[in-house]
Amino acid sequence: MAKIAILGFGTVGSGVYEVLCRNAAGVSRRAGEPVEVKYILDPKDFSGHPAANLFVKSIDTILQDPEVRVVVETIGGTRFAYPYVKACLESGRSVCTSNKEMVATYGAELLGLAKAHDCAFLFEASVGGGTPIITPMHQCLAANVISEVEGIVNGTTNFMLTNMVRENLSFDDALKVAQELGYAETKDPSDDVDGRDACRKIAILSSMVCGHQIYPQNIPTRGIRAITTADVEAAEKLGCVIKLIAWMKRGKDGSVAAGVEPCLVPKSNQLASVDDVFNAVLVKGDMLGDVVFYGKGAGKLPTASAVVADVVDALKHGSKVHDSLFWQPAEPVDGMLTDPTPAAYYVRVAGIAPAVAEAIYGYGKVVDERYDGCAYFVERADEKALAEAARKVEAVGGSVKLVLKRLPEEA
């Protein structure tokens, strides 16, 4: 019998316990042996819970029990999760986690510990929630050189942007609806709306693709706070919708660029039709071409099911999984991983007339003039040209309020 421990009994942790109880027979059959939860670590009082006898307060209880073979970490963050996970791996216990912040920051180190101590460190749920992407990328796409990954990886912001389009809601009203439905944090939704959640996810995928650690702090990241209903309407005029896109590109020379930013997505692009809390990730391989992974990105039981699938893999394969799921340590780079490739851009400026915007940005067209300024569509520019244009706007008393890159017509 395989004994496991769960660290943290919040939404995902309790979901893992529920999945293991409800689908015990199927999980045990796939693992090749019965799977049983022996401990649940959580400082809160669960004396009234049916599994109250499983709760412990100290990680040492788990570390000192040789029967525990797999540890599920669902605490979140890094303050407690990182040292606990490190100790578990060093003791030869496999770890399965949904903790994107920990994987994005310490992934290379923890993968190295798993290999060194003949165990597994698995994190399928850290990027797609219940939508598989980690396992398909390191197994099914192993014969491909991946050049690009882009997609919608945050269900909260996608739900908000969908409602800003469908219901003509402002950012604040869309956030309020998301909070009322439990899609956004009520106390502090900044990880979602400012793009940090998506940044951690694309950092993990970038590390997998590149074979070395890519850090979130090197990825330019912008959220959706600056999006207005007027921007949504202007996007419609351009045949587009606005989506928060996380992306990475790897050049033939080994160069890496990555980012998280709201973008204009043409309606002919398959990412444009991904709505509500659904996620979609497009992966471009040299042999397979384009493949899309689509599904709900979060939720108690979908996420828990991905974690439990990792538990099964850890029990069946152990450290062998790291023959393909592994990346090397690396130091953070100086500067940001920006993309020098020119693209079309939507720019909203305040404090200057449309004619001035046209003179500064060059070839393009005015999309909207309702502001104290205008919205201008730039046919072709790169990051350097946009930065220079922003300086010129400021020099004549204006300011740049929003910049949105337009994705290609088809992806």
Task: Cite the ranges covered by each PLM segment.
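N-terminal glycine-/serine-/threonine-rich beta1-alpha1-beta2 phosphate-ribose binding loop
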Residues: 1-91
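Flexible, glycine/charged-enriched surface loops at secondary-structure junctions
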Residues: 34, 188, 192, 213-221, ...
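Rossmann-like NAD(P)H-binding beta-loop-alpha module
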Residues: 68, 115-197, 204
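Rossmann-fold NAD(P)-binding glycine/threonine-rich loop
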Residues: 81-87, 91, 100-138
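A short hydrophobic/small-residue beta-strand
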Residues: 94-96
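Catalytic, metal-anchored helix/loop core of enzyme active sites in primary metabolism
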Residues: 146-150, 158-161, 165, 183-190, ...
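Substrate-binding/catalytic subdomain of NAD(P)-dependent oxidoreductase enzymes
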Residues: 173-273, 278-280
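A conserved regulatory-domain signal marking ACT and ACT-like small-molecule sensing domains
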Residues: 311-411
